[in-house]
Amino acid sequence: MNNVINQKLLGVLLQDAHLISDVQIQIALIDQQAYGMRLGDVLVLHGWLKQQTIDFFITRWNQLLAQGREYSLEYCLQEAGLLSDQQIELIRQEQIRSKRSFGNIAVQQRWVKPQTIDFFESALNHRQLAS
């Protein structure tokens, strides 16, 4: 039962971050039941998310939010496998040139959805206010 609860929470979390759509989660839940697979494995098998992204949200996300340290948007997006080292370097260069925010550039390049940036920034800011 606990595994089912964790899987539902994973699906909700990924939807909240706008990493998967309602339709994708419905298909994944059907496939999960039909094939007895874990939700994250189904999402990876469909090619909707990377294994690194699933692992980040299963093992690291709650830890990051619970720790007293500050984590940057850049760090979280990289750890979640949503941006590559090369993309991060290009964003940093553009930041120096344009003085725009990291998230703004990532969205403008269409590497990350604006709602995903909002999700991370909101969670990170909320955690900092709570500490």
Place the predicted regions along the sequence by residue.
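Non-catalytic accessory regions
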Residues: 1-131
